[in-house]
Amino acid sequence: MASIQNLYETVSRVLGNQAGKVISALGEITVECLPEHYISVMTALRDHEELHFELLVDLCGVDYSTYKNEAWQGKRFAVVSQLLSVKNNQRIRVRVWVSDDDFPVVESVVDIYNSADWYEREAFDLYGIMFNNHPDLRRILTDYGFVGHPFRKDFPISGYVEMRYDEEQKRVIYQPVTIEPREITPRIVREENYGGQ
């Protein structure tokens, strides 16, 4: 097993200018790239004989709009992939920043890693990130009629619609949310009455 420093140097050399940044922190390597280099970076990480990251073990969307409880200055959305090289016993993270915050789109990597199929559908469903050339990009966790993308940080906690069974229509129907926010008043316990004394 090669060291993290060796992996850092190899990845930097192999990817060259395609990688916007190669970061070594906390014993992990993260490659940050632009959307236009995403496919070539993922292909190089899989196919290069010194790297051989043959497995995509996770892919997710991230909404950085309020990262670390403060306003974020960069791009709002990113797609983060975790790759594994069984041959070299190494892991690497790839982060691609989505260029348009209003209509987030990146290329699909299903043709490179077929395990990305449902992960990309999940990122689309929960964050609204579109994946160009995905073979079946549709919702996977929420209803087909669901409004919005629930993991976006600007999505309301109570949602927009709720579903219930309508006895008259004998079916499940959607209606606007009827939940009223509650005011929670903390209960004060006085020492003299504490414990039933």
From Swiss-Prot:
Cellular compartments annotated: Cell inner membrane
Superkingdom as given in the UniProt entry: Bacteria
One CC-aspect GO term: plasma membrane
Known EC number: 7.1.1.-
Transmembrane residue ranges: none
Membrane topology: Peripheral membrane protein
EC primary class: translocase
InterPro entries per the UniProt record, alphabetical: NADH_DH_suC, NADH_quin_OxRdtase_su_C/D-like, NADH_UbQ_OxRdtase_30kDa_su, NADH_UbQ_OxRdtase_CS
Keywords, alphabetical: Cell inner membrane, Cell membrane, Membrane, NAD, Quinone, Translocase, Transport, Ubiquinone
Primary location group: membrane
UniProt catalytic activity: a quinone + NADH + 5 H(+)(in) = a quinol + NAD(+) + 4 H(+)(out)
A GO term for molecular function: NADH dehydrogenase (ubiquinone) activity
Quaternary state and interactors: NDH-1 is composed of 14 different subunits. Subunits NuoB, C, D, E, F, and G constitute the peripheral sector of the complex.
HAMAP family: NDH1_NuoC (MF_01357)
Entry-linked NCBIfam families: NuoC_fam (TIGR01961), PRK06074.1-1 (NF004730)
Similarity comment: family membership: Belongs to the complex I 30 kDa subunit family.
General function of this protein: NDH-1 shuttles electrons from NADH, via FMN and iron-sulfur (Fe-S) centers, to quinones in the respiratory chain. The immediate electron acceptor for the enzyme in this species is believed to be ubiquinone. Couples the redox reaction to proton translocation (for every two electrons transferred, four hydrogen ions are translocated across the cytoplasmic membrane), and thus conserves the redox energy in a proton gradient.
Name the record gives this protein: NADH-quinone oxidoreductase subunit C
Organism this protein belongs to: Neisseria meningitidis serogroup C / serotype 2a (strain ATCC 700532 / DSM 15464 / FAM18)
